[in-house]
Structures are given as structure tokens and as C-alpha cells.
Curated annotation (Swiss-Prot):
The active site is at 198 (proton acceptor). It comes from the Bacteria. It is found in: Cytoplasm. NADPH binds at residues 11, 30, 109, 147, 262, 286, 288. It comes from Cupriavidus taiwanensis (strain DSM 17343 / BCRC 17206 / CCUG 44338 / CIP 107171 / LMG 19424 / R1). HAMAP family: NAD_Glyc3P_dehydrog (MF_00394). Coiled coil: none annotated. This is Glycerol-3-phosphate dehydrogenase [NAD(P)+]. GO terms for biological process: carbohydrate metabolic process; glycerol-3-phosphate biosynthetic process; glycerol-3-phosphate catabolic process; glycerophospholipid metabolic process; phospholipid biosynthetic process. Belongs to the NAD-dependent glycerol-3-phosphate dehydrogenase family. Sn-glycerol 3-phosphate binds at residues 109, 143, 145, 198, 251, 261-263.
């Protein structure tokens, strides 16, 4: 199968390298020099230093040629591996092509700043505006996965949710091999809400661990955080079983407890007394939990949903509340039934 990956960050590169073992894969990025280095060394030194990539992975600096590689193949898939903020641009560029409709998957997790739209709602809006909804199949690939481990060939399991069963089938054919398992779903909303909210909750568990509050506190935050994720997801149209699966509790556990998690690191460093500006400056890469914390808090308020952990994270990030005071406020909440 022909696959094109748009975005040469850690996750796009890792998944492209995995897919290249059994597929014809092209990787596109905005920096031609970076792509040249990947081709020459089989390493993405900027995002996955020290990890050897598949020698079968090809790179292409020309956007149109890269897209045509997969889009002109009836079974091909274009995989958008940008953050949420770049998804609209990629969709517009794909919709602007005069050629046949594209099958596309995205890897980003979060809500759009300002609109609070989920990724599939953003994509649908762009396709509607371009008059290109006919024939376009699209969906999301999500679940518990650190890019470095995927690039190293370590086992993982992911969920694909799309607008058409055929897209999920093709995604399974492309990625379900070696150490990776792919499970299908038709709950686009649930899969995307799980991927967005878990990043916010991971900041909370990172802060708790940074304050030295122990494993009991971490388990409580993960469990009660899952309840918050589920409440919001159901209000937005997701299904409860999705939040009990890989895209929900699975991704939450990994991101909240794994030391490769950028969002967890944000919480740990905030707990140490660093400002948000200092934390982000030192991080070097995107932490989507920071970007979507405000959206989660505002969506909860709009729908009348109780999400005290997510609200506390938002207050620490943007309102000057210290991590220690946020924990104190959570502990002072009235007793209630689970």
C-alpha cells in the first residue's frame, strides 16, 4: 500500500518508519535539510536521536509530489502528522487538489483553539467549504503510544476510527504488523475526546508526582480523571465503551504515568516552581495538554459538566494558582458518592 506522511516530527517519523516495513512510504516535512539528513542517516536527529529508522522509508520535499504518491493510488492513505494547529492547513491543501478525493488519517490529539472543535469537525468544515466532501474518507489513529518506542519496534496497540469502514480496514492492513495491533472503531468523537482530555489529566498527575504525593494520589487522579473524560465525551456524543478502551483509559494511563510523556513533564516542572513560560521554553516540543486545557474547561462549563481536575489544571496553567494550592482545593471538595 502507498502511504504519505505529512509531518516529520517524532510521531509522524516513528509511524512512517514502522509502516515502511511492509508498505511503500514517503515522508514529507517543511524542512528540506531535515529530510535530507533523514535520507542520508536513517535517523531523525531532531526528534528521535539515536533511533535507527527503516532503510525503506523514502523522503520527499515537494508537497504535491509527496501527496500524489498516496493520493493517486485508490487504496493509498495520506497521514497528517502535524499538531492540531496545522490540521486545517493540511486539509485545505489536500482539498485544493483537482485530482481524485483523498483518504486521510490524522495523528493529532486536542481541540482547536478558539472554536473548541475536534479534529474531525475541523476537517469536515474545510471539506464543506471547498465543496470536496464527496468521496473523501477520513479518520483518526490514536491510542497509547510513545513515538520513541514505536520507532524502536516495541509493542503497542492503537485504535483507528473513520467515516468509512474501508478506511479502517486499509489502516489495519497498513499498520497491523510486527509489534503493532490496530483495532477498529466508528466512534470518531469518543476516540478524539479521549486523546485530547488525557493530555490535560497527565499534567495533573505529573504535578502530583512532582509534589511527592505518592502512588495512591496518582491512582486517584487517573481514576477520577477517567470519570471526567467520560462525562465530557458522552456530552459531546462519544460512547462509553470507547473511554474504557485504548483511546480512553489506555492512553490516559500511559500519558499520566510514563516518563516519556511531555504533558506529564509539564506538571512535574510546574510543581517544582517553574513558570509555564520556563517549562515550555525548556520542553522544545509540543505539549498538547497546555493548548487544550482551556478548551476542556470551557466545554465543561458550557455543557454543565463537573470536571474539577481539568479545571484545576487550567487554573495552574493560566490563573497563577500553584500546584500545591490546586491539590489542596481538590482535597477540600465535599464528600460524594462515586
Amino acid at each position: 500500500m502507498k502511504l504519505t506522511f505529512l509531518g516529520a516530527g517524532a510521531w509522524g517519523t516513528a509511524l512512517a518508519s514502522h509502516a515502511a516495513a511492509t508498505n511503500d512510504v514517503v515522508l514529507w516535512g517543511r524542512d528540506p535539510a531535515q529530510l535530507g539528513a533523514i535520507a542520508a542517516t536513517h535517523e531523525n536527529a531532531a526528534y528521535l536521536p539515536g533511533v535507527k529508522l527503516s532503510a525503506r522509508l523514502a523522503v520527499q520535499a515537494d508537497f504535491e509530489l509527496a501527496v500524489a504518491h498516496a493520493a493517486d493510488d485508490p487504496d493509498g492513505i495520506v497521514v497528517v502528522a502535524t499538531p492540531v494547529a496545522g490540521l486545517r492547513e493540511m486539509t485545505r491543501r489536500l482539498a485544493a487538489r483537482s485530482a481524485r478525493p483523498v483518504s486521510m488519517l490524522w495523528l493529532c490529539k486536542g481541540f482547536e483553539a478558539g472554536t473548541h472543535l475536534l479534529p474531525h469537525q475541523m476537517v469536515r468544515a474545510e471539506l464543506d467549504a471547498a465543496g470536496r466532501t464527496e468521496g473523501f474518507a477520513y479518520g483518526v489513529l490514536s491510542g497509547p503510544s510513545f513515538a520513541r518506542e514505536v520507532a524502536q519496534g516495541l509493542p503497542c496497540a492503537l485504535t483507528v476510527a473513520g467515516t468509512e469502514p474501508s478506511l479502517a480496514d486499509r489502516a489495519q492492513a497498513a499498520f497491523h504488523h510486527h509489534a503493532m495491533r490496530i483495532y477498529g472503531s466508528d466512534d470518531l468523537t469518543g476516540v478524539e475526546v479521549g486523546g485530547a482530555v488525557k493530555n490535560v489529566l497527565a499534567i495533573a498527575t505529573g504535578a502530583s508526582d512532582g509534589l511527592g504525593l505518592g502512588l495512591n494520589a496518582r491512582a486517584a487522579l487517573v481514576t477520577r480523571g477517567l470519570a471526567e473524560m467520560t462525562r465530557l465525551g458522552l456530552a459531546l456524543g462519544g460512547r462509553v465503551e470507547t473511554f474504557m478502551g485504548l483511546a480512553g483509559v489506555g492512553d490516559l494511563i500511559l500519558t499520566a504515568t510514563g516518563d516519556l510523556s511531555r504533558n506529564r513533564k509539564v506538571g512535574q516542572q510546574l510543581a517544582s516552581g517553574q513558570s509555564l513560560e520556563q517549562v515550555l521554553a525548556g520542553l522544545g516540543h509540543v505539549a498538547e495538554g497546555v493548548r487544550c486545557a482551556q478548551a476542556v474547561a470551557e466545554l465543561a462549563a458550557t455543557h454543565g459538566i463537573e470536571m474539577p481536575i481539568a479545571r484545576a489544571v487550567c487554573a495552574v496553567l493560566f490563573d497563577g494558582l500553584s500546584a500545591a494550592d490546586a491539590v489542596a482545593q481538590l482535597l477540600q471538595r465535599d464528600a460524594r458518592d462515586e
